[in-house]
Each structure stands twice: as structure tokens, then as C-alpha cells.
UniProtKB/Swiss-Prot annotation:
GO terms for biological process: succinyl-CoA metabolic process; tricarboxylic acid cycle. Pathway: Carbohydrate metabolism; tricarboxylic acid cycle; succinate from succinyl-CoA (ligase route): step 1/1. This is Succinate--CoA ligase [ADP-forming] subunit beta. GO terms for cellular component: cytosol; succinate-CoA ligase complex. PANTHER family: SUCCINATE--COA LIGASE [GDP-FORMING] SUBUNIT BETA, MITOCHONDRIAL, SUCCINYL-COA SYNTHETASE BETA CHAIN. Binds 1 Mg(2+) ion per subunit. Substrate binds at residues 264, 320-322. Belongs to the succinate/malate CoA ligase beta subunit family. Heterotetramer of two alpha and two beta subunits. PROSITE patterns: SUCCINYL_COA_LIG_3. Pfam families: ATP-grasp_2, Ligase_CoA. Its EC number is 6.2.1.5. Transmembrane segments: none annotated.
Amino acid sequence: MNVHEFQAKGILSGFDVRVPKGVVVRSVEEVDSALGSLAAGIVAVKAQIHAGGRGKAGGVKIGKAREEVADLVKSMLGSVLVTHQTSAAGQKVHAVYLEEGVSIKKEYYLGAVVDRKAGMVSVIFSSEGGMDIEEVAHSRPEMVVVVNVDPVYGFLDFHGRKLCYGLGLKKEQVVQITAMARKVCRALMETDASQVEINPLVETTCGEFIALDAKMTFDDNGLFRRPEIVKLTDPHEYSEEELEAAKYGLSYIKLDGNIGCMVNGAGLAMATMDIVKYYGGEPANFLDVGGGASKDTVREAFKIILRSGVDGILVNIFGGIMRCDVIAAGIIESAKEIGVSVPMVVRLSGTNYKIGKEMLDASGLSIVTAENLDEAARFVVDLVGKRG
């Protein structure tokens, strides 16, 4: 789950991370009141969407006079931002964050992410702030320092020294960066976040460090114990299909392609999308029905896939916990009830897969069965190509 910048800053400020004062507005009429609570001077006007790259897309501007800020807010609200992190359709702006300007001396990057392989929290620090950290790590790896933090002990002073001295910072800077990194680490661990990113973390001309931008991503599996985080969900940032999928416990992400994919297991779902693209197709979605899918779940999954106007459907199921014959029955019932009119290819493997395949072949429906994933991907891409 993602949250907006102003929400991430609200969370981080609760951990004593210093952020500029700001107010979120959702209409031009709110601008006067918002500016009245901010210090006079320049104001950063920031479109709030769940994607990075806003600045390059025109989603971050600087205003001074009230009229200028109001005009910027008016131009942003309702506009669609297309960045390198959005789909081609972009994301519509429903809220704008007005923030007091900061006198910047130097920009840094500070982030924390769960390293599942190491079983630790990786804290990343760079003296090249305001840029894509992956790009910096690729082009100038010497400017990025990473330390692994054991969540049992938390962020310790020696971690901070390693981060800062590796980039040649001064003693007074080390003290502040160490304190900031410790707070970021705590925020990640105590909110079940999977990522916290401050980019840029700025050093002001007064020598203070402030989070000028913030991003937080939360582990969906931990949300059941974080109701305060769930309340921050912005339905505007999700498609109708994604909201509907959440009601039935389905993991769904809408993509830009035309081949709908229904798979059980996130890893298998990603592999399925990869092989569809390998054969020249374009996945329309990521859809994981989970390990305990029922007939009802399969039916709702079909409805969600078809709602997005796909030209073909690929069902790839591995029967471990679930039985392939139960899935086959759900596919048949759903296809008859909904009336699937696009080509459908089904690949079943695992528990009772032979029974499931026989049920599909005997259903009288236009369902193509495949022996393996490679064959299934080729079939669906060919069928969609012929149809188009």
C-alpha cells in the first residue's frame, strides 16, 4: 500500500523527523486559508499522486504571490500526470500540497528498505539527492553507502558513522544524519512499512536537515494490525478493478496490455506475464487469486478481467493447496454465467490437473487447454493476434 507525500510526512513527523510545514488542499477555494497558516515567502506547490517523477511532469512548482499559487493549484487539480512510474494513461490529481519554502544548501538521499534476502533493514544514504537512487547507484556507485541493520538491535551509532564517513561528511553532519537515519529505521519497523524514502533530504543554509520529500510503502500483509495506516487509503489512486479485487482478497494491478492473466501465486503471476511478453503479447493485468481460491473467487476474478476490455485470457493455475478440478469447475461456471466471448487458454498443473483438464475439454466451451506454460503463452498470443 502506498500513501501520499503529505501522509508520509505526517507519519515521519510522528517519529520526530523534521519536515517543512505544509497544508493539503483539494480546491482552489481552500488556498487562502492554507496560505494563512504558512509563513510568508515562496511556497512549493506539489501535486499528490502515488508516483515519483512529479517534478519532470510538471507536478511540482514554486509560487510566491497568492494569485500565482492559486493559479498553480487550479492548473494541477484535475490534471493528469504521466511520469516514468505511472501507466501511459497517467494519474489524475485530486489533491495538492502547499509547503513552506526551504533555503537549500545541499541535497542528500536517505532511505530504508526491507532486505528479505538478508533478513535485515537496508539503510541507504547518498550525497546525490533529488535524483533516482537506482540511476546514481549505476552511474556513480561510490556516492551510495548501504548498511544492514538488524531489527532486533535497531540503528546504532556505528551504522551512522559508516554511512557518513563513507561520503566524507563532517562531525556535526554525522550527528544529525545518524539521528535522522535512526528515526527513519524506527518508522519503517514500527509501522510495518517495506520502504521509507526521503529524497531529497536537504541540509539548509542554517545547517539543519529536513525531509523535503517523503515516500512510504507498506506491506499489505501487515495492514490488519495497522488500522491507522489503512485509513490513509486514497480510493482515487486505484482503478475500479483494483478496488473491486480488494473486496474479494484478490491481488490485482491493472496494466496497459490486452491479455488478461489469472494466476495463483505472485511469483507464478510474474513469470506468466514475462512469458506472455516474450512471445509478443502484452499483459493487461497482474492478478493473483491466491492459494485458496474458490469457485466464487474465480467468478469475480473473471468479471474483473473482462471489465477492462481484454482481447484474450490466460489462466495459469498450479494446484498445490487448491485442486485443479475445483478451479476447472469455477472456470466453466463463470464462463457460462458471464458469457466469455474472447479467446481463453487454460493451463492446469498439480493436484487433480488431469481431471480438471478433462472437465474443460468436455465443457463444450471454446476453451483451449495447454500442457505447459510455454505452450499456453504461445496459444493465447496467437489467438489474440488472429482475432485482432
